[in-house]
Each structure stands twice: as C-alpha cells, then as structure tokens.
C-alpha cells in the first residue's frame, strides 16, 4: 500500500487536490490517505504517531498545492518536527526512511511554461523542489521524480 500524506489547508475549496483524493479513495486496497490539516487542526503534531505511520509504509507520496514557491506551512513543520536526529538520520538506529520510495504530487496554479528558464519565474518546478530531493536523499529515502498538475 501507498501512504498519501495530504497537506492542503482547505481541501474542500480545492479543485485538483480534492479530485486526486476522490480518485484515490476509490482504491482503498492500494492507498491510505493521511490528511495532516484534518488530523491536526491546531497544527500540533503527534510526532510519535507520525513516525509510526511512516514506519508502516514502504511507499509515501506527499500531496500538496505549491504555495509561494514552497509548501503549505504544516508540511514544513512536519518535515522539521518529524525528521529528527536518531530517527530519520544520524545514527545506526536512525534512517527510518531509508529505502522507502518517496514522491511529491504537487498542484501548481499556473501554466508549466511559466516554470522554465525562459518563463516569468526563470526556474523549473524541479529546481524549486530541489530542497525536497536533497532532504529525502539525506535521510536515504528513494526519492522519485515529482508529479505536477499545472494550471487549474
């Protein structure tokens, strides 16, 4: 099974992310959906619960809208709080993400051409998401190419 960690602060108003989740829910034998904003409306993460959840899966997808060339705030908090020393990296007992397949599924509200060297922002989405790739490589996860839905 694949764990899909949904990080959308207002999924009910979403178009793309909401549709993705509706489609994934048709296959409960293949996907488990963990909605961070629903699980933690106060944004106070249960770190132990999150770590146990990660340990239970070999395939993890982070699904979120691209906000201000980054992530929704709760995903940044999740990365900072969950990926800690001696669990995610830095010791022989750590590296709990090691060899887990990890991918990003991102909705982007503008056209793909805008995210190019020649586009208005001068950077590709792959370049802008390099910190994710580096983070997951650092903790020895098997980082897969991102999937993006451009436009609305």
Residue ranges and their predicted role:
Residues 9-11, 38-40, 122, 150-152:
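Short histidine/acidic/glycine/proline-rich micro-motifs that form metal-
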